[in-house]
Structures are given as structure tokens and as C-alpha cells.
């Protein structure tokens, strides 16, 4: 299934005995979901498939100017809900497992609280549930910004600008240090391959 703002990928179990409860993985809006399946020996998706789960991965596309007014309500109650229903229908399942990562965890928690009748299990990794307790550098900076003015001026923040914001969290590690590590490990083919996969 593919729409303008997302595509739903389906991975079939690697074993004969398949769990009756399929998993829908909801990834973050600002990163790419392929990080969960970079290579066979470092794949969260492959690990779940080997445990007998049928996996669906919600891969968000970058919003464009025409998506300026798309809201969290649209993401949670339209797009995620559409995917949940596809997973339910494909697997003849009344309830599914919703597995979120980062912002996907927050959206999955919202969805589960609103649609408990469709969710058997909620699994979250790195969720932000209570933003009032977030004391990271980026949270403190964002509290000083006029978000409404930012959105009305430029619309959606381009992905490269979001990356710049996230690099503020660990500027040396995100900026220079990763390249020093590459130089130090340039003769290690496995390290170089992993670096290239993540940095592409």
C-alpha cells in the first residue's frame, strides 16, 4: 500500500509457525525506517521475523508544501488507522501489536489510547510521552521559538533543517567525531559498510 505521505511494507515471517498477532511498526516521521533493516546481521525487522511474527512497517515520506496543514490528528487517526485496518484485514486479526519508535512511539501511544479495541499490545522504543519533562537541549531551544510563526512562514520544516536541529544534541559526535571514527577504522570493511549504510 502506498499513498502520498507513506508506504506500508509487509515482511513475511521467516519460520513456519507464525504468531496470530501481526506487528505494525510505526517509525519516526523525521528519520528513515530502513534503519531497522539495514543488513541481515543487524536488522530489528529480521530478528522479529525469525521469532515468527508477520511484520508491517509504516514508512513515512517527507511532507511537501501541500502538506502544511496535515496535523497529528491526520497522522494518528487517518494514516495509522488506515494501516491498522489493512494489517487486520490481511491477517484476519481482530487486534494487532502496535510497535513505535521515537516519534512513532508517541503516535502509537496516542493511537492506542483512542482505539484500544484494535490493539492487543503496545510496544514503544524511545517514546516522548510527557514533553513538559523533556530537558534536552533541543526541547529547551524549541520552548523559546514561536512555532506557529515558523510554520506560517515556511510551512513544514525541511528534513535537512530538522537534522541540523538534532545535531545540536551532540554537535561533536554528529558533526566531526563520526568522521574521525571513519578514518580510524578505514581498514575495517565491516565498519566502513555500516557507516556508508547509515550516512547515505
Residue ranges and their predicted role:
Residues 89, 93, 107-200:
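Alpha/beta-hydrolase-fold enzymes
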Residues 56, 97, 121-123:
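A structural signal for isolated positions on well-ordered beta-strands in alpha/beta enzyme cores
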Amino acid at each position: 500500500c502506498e499513498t502520498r505521505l507513506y508506504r506500508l511494507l509487509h515482511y513475511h515471517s521467516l519460520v513456519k509457525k507464525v504468531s496470530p498477532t501481526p506487528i505494525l511498526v510505526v517509525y519516526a516521521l523525521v528519520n528513515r525506517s530502513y534503519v531497522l533493516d539495514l543488513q541481515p546481521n543487524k536488522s530489528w525487522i529480521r530478528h522479529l521475523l525469525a521469532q515468527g511474527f508477520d511484520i508491517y512497517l509504516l514508512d513515512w515520506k517527507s511532507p511537501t508544501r501541500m502538506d502544511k496543514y496535515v496535523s497529528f490528528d491526520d497522522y494518528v487517526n487517518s494514516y495509522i488507522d488506515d494501516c491498522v485496518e489493512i494489517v487486520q484485514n490481511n491477517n484476519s486479526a481482530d487486534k494487532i501489536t502496535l510497535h513505535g519508535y521515537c516519534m512513532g512511539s508517541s503516535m502509537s501511544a496516542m493511537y492506542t489510547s483512542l482505539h484500544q479495541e484494535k490493539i492487543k499490545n503496545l510496544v514503544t522504543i524511545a517514546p516522548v510521552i510527557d514533553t513538559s519533562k523533556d530537558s534536552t537541549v533541543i526541547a529547551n531551544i524549541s520552548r523559546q521559538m514561536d512555532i506557529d510563526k515558523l510554520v506560517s512562514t515556511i510551512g513544514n520544516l525541511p528534513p535537512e533543517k530538522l537534522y541540523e536541529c538534532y545535531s545540536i544534541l551532540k554537535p561533536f559526535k554528529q558533526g566531526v567525531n563520526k568522521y574521525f571514527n571513519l578514518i580510524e577504522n578505514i581498514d575495517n570493511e565491516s565498519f566502513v559498510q555500516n557507516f556508508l549504510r547509515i550516512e547515505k
